[in-house]
Amino acid sequence: MANCGESKKRVVVLGGGMAGSLVAKTLQYSADVTLIDPKEYFEITWANLRTTVEPSFGERTVINHRDYLVNGRILTSSATNVTENEVVTADDHVVPYDYLVVATGHVEPVPQTRTERLNHYQKENQKIKSAKSILIVGGGPSGVELAGEIAVDFPDKKLTLVHKGSRLLEFIGPKAADKALNWLKAHRVEVKLGQSVDLRNVSDEGTYATSAGETIQADCHFLCIGIPLGSAWLRESILKDKLDNRGRLMVDENLLVKGHKNIFAIGDITDIPEAKQGYLAQKHALVTAKNINLLMDGQKESKLATYQPGSAIAIVSLGRKEAVAQFPFVTISGCIPGKIKSKDLFVTKTRKDRGLDSGIPSSKNKCS
């Protein structure tokens, strides 16, 4: 590390999601860290569907950046350009860096403040409570998990899930998809595969038309489909030639952007051949933090830690007590994988990784 008489190296982290928040927290005492994020908080994104049915859960999962980044600067803005040694933000801040970490993930229009985000969940929850019938569009992990949360917490609701693919959960294997489908059907969720929904033409009576010519009656809908990568702004930057044809930054085994010695990319924005999952993004963050510390210590690039793409492991929650899990050699469903993920959704661990307590009120920690 730098000697006491030396100024610390400047590390700028773009994006305060699963990856960006952890790398900023990890480096805050060894480097001069600046986190640039359009929102004032970090969110445990895989828990937001539970927060939709239980808004108070958000008190633990929506966390102000300042709660974990106590020794760094926070700029609530978006990056609009990057040069060899500076980042330019939407409000015309010019932020110099010695090391840059691009962790901008996906672009999702969310509120800027924690209070606004928690209020959003209250409104979504009220939307569910007020509806007798609900349409979920999208059968990836978000759509399946939302259907599971509503089916368990609000079993009286009529639920329909429409997915354009031939099976659910296409990012993992067909065995896991079949188990999820069977669970949804057993919990009275109507699943329509191989169809899409035209959300631009919904009748006043709540009639939705599918691409197969079917109609669905629903009082409200939730859109659970993919959102674009947060890389469009890079197309006019020095990194424009480092984007692949899908808009992902190409990185080497050290998570350095190819052709650069001081710019890292982590999380969903990378071209690493693996499923884009939060726990893997956090592994990226720890490897990158280690490598930046090594570089600040004067180590050669040959000494840097390498990242191996993650294997096809996934756990998809099915309500509060069950889940479907895919491991390298087995796929299981039910209460066993549910105990691994579904009860707490790894919230306590994720908070601990950022130096925070569980966030559970003390009265709930006591034995009954």
Describe the residue ranges of each PLM region.
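A Rossmann-like FAD-binding core segment of flavoenzymes
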Residues: I74-S77, N81-V88, V95, P155-E253, ...
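Glycine-rich active-site loop/strand segments that organize a redox cofactor
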Residues: I36-E54, G58, A103-K127, A325-Q326, ...
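C-terminal, flexible cofactor-proximal segment of oxidoreductases
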Residues: E6, A275, H284-S368
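FAD-binding core/adjacent interface of flavoenzyme oxidoreductases
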Residues: M1-V12, V70-L135, S211, F222-C224
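FAD-site-proximal beta/loop scaffold in flavoenzymes
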Residues: R114-K132, I216-C220, C224-L286, K290, ...
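Short beta-strand/turn micro-motifs composed of small residues
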Residues: G15, D37, G138, H163, ...
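Short strand-loop-helix active-site module centered on a catalytic nucleophile
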Residues: I134-E149
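Beta1-alpha1 glycine-rich phosphate/pyrophosphate-binding loop at the start
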Residues: A2-L75, E145-K175
